[in-house]
Amino acid sequence: KGERRFLLTDEKHPVYLTAGDVRQLQLSISAILSGIEVLLKKAGLASSELNRIYLAGAFGCYIDIESSIKTGLFPKLPTEKILQAGNLAGTGAAMVLLSSHALLKMEKEAGNIVHVELAEDEEFKELFLFNMNFVN
């Protein structure tokens, strides 16, 4: 391509970092952090009020929590408040299939869910632009 790149490993097994890679990282971090900030505001909470953040699925299993906080992906919280929880969708499905009590509880909680369309939220758009900077 002719794109400038930085070699991260040895020449035998080359892994390169490009400006495009950095840009994608900026966009990804900004989208996740901005989404978290909007949802917290709509819930009337500050990140400092969170007792726990559960990270689920493959994303939650393999992400380095400390690096994620340092890069700004997550709010600045003590690492012990962020828990890698594994396959919660599978666990939840098994719970409601095996327990009528769990099914009733899930149905009740489902009524409390509020859908937030972040792509159309003006505050999200503003935060997304602001959070693209690594200096936040």
Where are these regions (language model features)?
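Helical "lid/coupling" subdomains associated with nucleotide-phosphate turnover
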Residues: 1-136
